Amino acid sequence: MNTAYNFIQSYTHDGRIGVLVEFEFELSVTASEPEFLVVSKDIAMHIAALAPRDVKTLLAQPFVKGEHLSVSERLAEASVRVEDRVKVKRYVRWVAESDEPQQEQPEPPAAPAAALRRSAAG
């Protein structure tokens, strides 16, 4: 069984749009790889700019920092460079003018204690 590690990247645009993106990968060192940190921030910025309706739509979109690649292709490039399988698990995009977050509806997050027990067991 493979252990999954998660990393949440944040991005804010002019204090009016906020994004949190949860990434999943197999190696704990991936979270500190410069290539991963750049692509995770860029994907969060992409979500802020284009407001995709769900992860599937996000991955199919032309990447905002280089339209010759899709978001999925850019993530695959980064995965090769960090030698790990990196995927976007879920995200939330919040607009300050709105009372509601714009997000796909994933399962609710686990209680912090349950998540901590899972990571300690792995």
What are the functions of these language-model segments?
Residues 1-122:
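N-terminal assembly/interaction segments in proteins that build large macromolecular machines
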